[in-house]
Amino acid sequence: MLPFKLIYDHCYDLNLGDHVFPSQKYRLVYERLLHGGIADNSDFLSPQPAKDEDVLRVHTPEYVRKLKTASLSYAEILQLEIPYSQELIEACWLAAGGSILAGQRALQDGWSANVGGGFHHACPDHGEGFCVIHDVAIAIRRLQFDKAIERAMVIDTDVHHGNGTAAIFAGDKNVFTLSIHQLHNYPFVKPPSTMDINLPNGVGDDEYLTILDEHLRKAFSDFSPQIIFYVAGADPYREDQLGGLALTMQGLASRDALVMDYARKNKCPLVITLAGGYARRVEDTVAIHVGTIIAARDAAGKSGSTEAQFTIRGQQSARRPQPPPESHS
């Protein structure tokens, strides 16, 4: 039994045929967590779809109308790069509801994971790059609307820049957006995040971890979040079909541990979303995502009693952020 909740619904798994986006990974992660003895049925919660009012805090009414009435133009559907269907829209609203619920549970338990989500390319008035609506932004805006938090941080380690995240939160001093990504990769127009880490092709474990540690240290020095949304893409993996970095599975596990340590040391609730992952073997992508959940479990174990260790419902006392141990850099 895990010390936090996992959010999942079988509808996350769309039948996309031989599309490069492996939507079956959500089901496979769920099954591996269960059958591997990492989680049991009581650890999982099924979300409700996001309400339209939640989606409309992030996306324009015209875009939402087009999505719900199947009236996107041919060009807009091409920009999504994923087959449009009513099932797709239902799954996206459900994933957004999953990230809302994950945020609520993280504030209660210290940690949570949406076994899905992380659709960081979705912009206010359009979707792109397999991302229809921006579940993380929707969750942050809902938590702010509920006055559960004021300040949030997005740590995006997907190999692709979080352009939708950057566009949605541009100029918002209450949301700190950090994106570490391959520079010469999609998207080709990259609006500025609060902190962008542009990596050249071929960066491997040691260099990546050193750079990420340096920037996380600076980010937590500059900003004191009340919740972290961790967009934990599996695609920096060296065998990823859509990436050009060279991280090993062990390097990705160290990445996860590093991010978790910053959350733990700063007593900040953290939400995992899975984001991208397109390894030649889907089993590799699944293993990386499962490893992220394991990293959260291990970090929660170091924290002791999660509810006692974390600031709940956004009532955060003044403090100086603390870096994790040097051995993780």
What is each model feature region?
Residues Y74-S329:
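A general "terminal functional-core" signal
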Residues L2-A137:
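Metal-dependent C-N hydrolase catalytic cores
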